[in-house]
Design a protein with these regions (language model features):
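N-terminal pre-core extensions flanking Radical SAM catalytic domains
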Residues: 1-2, 6-8, 26-27, 75
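N-terminal pre-triad scaffold of radical SAM enzymes
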Residues: 9-63, 83-92
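N-terminal-biased segments
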Residues: 20, 28, 50-57, 96-126, ...
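Iron-sulfur cluster-binding cysteine motifs and their immediate structural context
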Residues: 37-44, 65-83, 94-111
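Short glycine-enriched, charge-decorated loop/helix-capping segments at active-site entrances
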Residues: 53-55, 107, 199-205, 274-279
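Short, basic/glycine-rich phosphate-binding loops at helix/coil junctions
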Residues: 97-102, 191-194, 224-225, 271-273
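Conserved AdoMet/S-adenosylmethionine-binding subsite of the radical SAM
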Residues: 116-266
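A structural motif corresponding to the C-terminal lobe/cap of the Radical SAM core domain
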Residues: 247, 255, 270-279
């Protein structure tokens, strides 16, 4: 995927303290080849803009009703409480009509943003970066799915901005190594050493991910790399599963290994996107 002069993003989170050193501005890129069953950012998965509906914001048919007047036929209905009901299966790919919603209950998730504009946003907090630790963290989705991420990182370094990335590792190896040239820190997910389980829970095999981590460590031995493992009940939470990951990582010069607890903070987003949470 490649936006010609920018990146497809779905969120920018400022003042983050958990995605790299110091105060970070986290830019979330859209599109991911994995479909993790526990994903807390389902709006990150599709590599194109999509419709999202926040029902709690809807002010109802009698007070508004503009969505039904502007949406394609069959997309909008109303419940007994007068709030809109969205038939996502009929929504198509053109969501321009949803700008009519005054409460922003209906919105487009994902927009292309020029690299310069992204970096200008990051530099709004430059005072924190210049006088202490902090900088830009690229997350997703899988940020390496977008080719322009290298240009973003390169231009960030030209502006003397500290850079980090959060990646699944499921990416083209050369693209990963090229991006690494402009990264101060890499957060790299290793979810399971069991390939059968990995495929069942994420939709992809783990061979590329494991090989890419080895290549990254060999090609960039000085790079600060933190491996993260989300510990998911029934998937990789057994002592045996975690020991396999630990044994694999012990052969590599990893800075540290973080085990992240399972949570359900993102479950509500699935309903907003017309999907079901699958874990």
């Amino acid at each position: 995927m490649n936006c010609h002069d920018g990146l497809l993003i779905f969120n920018v989170q400022r003042y983050s303290l958990h995605d790299g050193e110091g105060i970070r501005t986290v830019v979330f890129l859209k599109g991911c080849p994995l479909k993790c069953r526990w994903c807390c950012n389902p709006e990150s998965q599709k590599a194109n803009p999509e419709l999202i509906y926040r029902r709690s914001r809807c002010i109802g048919r009698d007070a508004c009703g503009l969505c039904a007047q502007n949406a394609p036929k069959g997309v909008i209905f109303f419940a007994e409480d007068q709030k809109a009901v969205v038939n996502f299966g009929c929504a198509g790919n053109d969501f321009s009509w949803c700008v009519c919603c005054p409460a922003q209950a209906l919105a487009i998730e994902g927009r292309e943003v020029p690299i310069g504009e992204i970096l200008d946003t990051v530099e709004q907090d430059a005072a924190f970066y210049r006088h202490g630790k902090g900088g830009l963290t690229i997350s997703g989705g899988e940020p390496l799915l977008q080719k322009n991420v290298v240009n973003l990182l390169k231009q960030a370094k030209e502006r003397r901005i500290n850079t980090s990335i959060e990646t699944s590792g499921y990416a083209d190896r050369e693209h990963l190594l090229e991006a690494a040239k402009y990264l101060d820190e890499v957060f790299y997910d290793i979810k399971s050493l069991d390939d059968e389980k990995h495929y069942a829970y994420t939709g992809v095999h783990n061979k590329r991910i494991l090989e890419n981590l080895v290549s990254l460590c060999q090609s960039c031995p000085e790079k600060k790399i933190t491996v993260r493992t989300p510990v998911i009940p029934g998937f990789n939470d057994s002592k045996e599963d975690l020991k396999k990951i630990e044994t694999f990582l012990n052969e590599l010069p990893i800075v540290k290994w973080e085990k992240l607890p399972y949570h359900t903070y993102g479950v509500g987003k699935y309903e907003m996107l017309g999907r079901k949470y699958s874990l």
